[in-house]
């Protein structure tokens, strides 16, 4: 069988590279800092995270006696379909002091640093402004009294938690909150907000709840 000429091989490789670039370009073009549609405020249920991950690594937020309930996992820029991550930005990274200062709402400075790298850079904000916005978003959401101090482990369906948040936060709508589970335990509550932190409906790809009942372990 005749071998292809070197010129023919080069032309074929150039065509392949061009095709791959045309496929990849729309994806890469999406993840530009500051270009997104809304935010998701993710509130992690610390007892579940500590039981599955944090205790094993000796995480700061899982220290004995802290008895943390809901903490901020992150404030995530979202598209109406999908989400950006690890965006390129000219914003400077936060100092260790700035990330450590977020431990009171996020559980640890390490998590604040990770969230900045993956999500904060996509906000188009300076690090200090992104953390200030994260803190403000958390401040605007009232944790239902019944869920702020769970005295013992309980099994609940997602709707009970959603209804409690909606009742405690006027303006929040059923389509604007989702409950996520992991290993049959409550993982997080995710609340959709406009760019100026007003309640809004989540995009369809973010409206996924836990199926059935799940464990909500008590803080310890």
Each model region followed by its residue ranges:
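Sec-dependent signal peptide recognition
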Residues: 13-19
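N-terminal signal peptide c-region/cleavage motif recognized by signal peptidases
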Residues: 24-26
């Amino acid at each position: 069988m005749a071998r292809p000429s070197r010129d023919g091989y080069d032309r074929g490789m150039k065509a392949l590279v061009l095709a791959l670039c045309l496929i990849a370009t729309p994806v890469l073009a999406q993840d530009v800092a500051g270009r997104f549609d809304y935010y998701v405020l993710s509130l992690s249920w610390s007892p579940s995270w500590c039981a599955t991950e944090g205790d094993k690594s000796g995480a700061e937020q899982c220290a004995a006696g802290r008895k943390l309930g809901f903490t901020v996992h992150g404030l995530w820029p979202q598209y109406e379909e999908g989400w950006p991550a690890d965006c390129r930005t000219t914003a400077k990274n936060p100092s260790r002091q700035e990330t450590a200062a977020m431990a009171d709402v996020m559980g640890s400075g390490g998590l604040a640093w990770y969230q900045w790298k993956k999500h904060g850079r996509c906000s188009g904000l300076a690090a200090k402004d992104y953390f200030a916005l994260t803190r403000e978003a958390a401040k605007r959401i009232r944790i239902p009294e019944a869920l702020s101090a769970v005295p013992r482990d309980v099994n609940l369906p997602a709707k009970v938690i959603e209804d409690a948040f909606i009742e405690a936060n006027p303006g929040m709508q059923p389509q604007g909150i989702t409950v996520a589970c992991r290993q049959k335990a409550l993982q997080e509550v995710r609340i959709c907000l406009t760019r100026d932190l007003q309640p809004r409906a989540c995009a369809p790809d973010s409206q996924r709840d836990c199926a059935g009942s799940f464990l909500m372990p008590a803080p310890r």
